[in-house]
Amino acid sequence: MNNQPIGVFDSGVGGLSVWREIVRQLPYESILYLADRAHVPYGNRSSREVLAYCDAICGLLIDQGCKAIVVACNTASAVALQALRDLHPSVPILGLEPAVKPAVSLSHTKVVGVMATPATFQGQLFRATVGRCATDVKVVEQVCLGLADWVESGASEEELETLLKGFLTPMLEAKADTIVLGCTHYPFVIDTIRRLAGKDLRVIDPAPAVAAHLAKVLGERGLTAGTKEPGQHRFLSTGDAASFNAACRRLLGLPVQCEEIRWSLGPEGRLSLGQPSPAPHQQKPPQAF
C-alpha cells in the first residue's frame, strides 16, 4: 500500500480527460496534475523540445513524491515515453498508445480514422502500433491543427463546428466507421463529433483504458492507496493559474486553485522547473463531472 500521489501531466488541459477517468476508476488515489501551458501544444514542438520538457517535469513529479507518472499527452508519449522510462527508472511511467487495436476490432468497413497531431503520426509508437494491429485495415490519418488550441481557449461553438467538419469529412468520405481520438484534448469535444458525424460512427476515447492499466500496474507493484478516503488533488501550471482555473470550470465543472510554477535555464543550459510551494492546495474531487 502506498498513499503517495500519482503524477499526471500534459502540455495543457487535455490531460484532464485522463485525470477525470483516473478519479472515476481510482477514487481513493491522490493526483498531482501538471499542465505545461507555457509550451502548449506539444504537437507544434520539435521532438527534442518535447523530450526536454517531459524530462524536467518527470523529475519534478518524482521530487514531489509521486509513486507513478502518467504521460497524459499523445504527442509526448509518441516522442518521449521510452526515453522517460530510461531516464527515470525509479517509478513506473505510463503513456498513451493510439487506440488502433480496439478500433480495428470494432470496424465493419475496415476503415479506421485517427485524429491526432503531426508529431503523434510521426512518432515511432504510432507507426509500430499501426504495423502491429492494422495490417488488414485502412487507417486514415487526420491531422487536427487548431483543435487542441480550441479546447484550451474555449472559443465559439461555431468555430469548433467549422474545424470538426473539415477534419471529419475526409475520414467519412473514406468510409471510416470508427474514429480514434489520438489527443487527450479531443474527448472534451466528443459530443460535438458524434452530433456532426452521426450516431453510427464509433468514437474511441483512450482514457478509460489508460486508467484501467494504471490500476493494474499499481496493484502489481503494491502501490495502491491504503485508504478508503477520497483522494486529494493538486494542480500546477507553468502558465497563468487563473486561465487554467477557468478552463477546469468550463471543461469539468471543477473549482480548482492552481499553483503557478516557472521554467528556468539551469546548469549547462538544462531546463528546470521551480519547486511549488511547500504548503500545497489540495482539493477533493467534485461529486460529478
Mark where each language-model region is:
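Non-catalytic structural scaffold of enzyme domains
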Residues: M1-F289
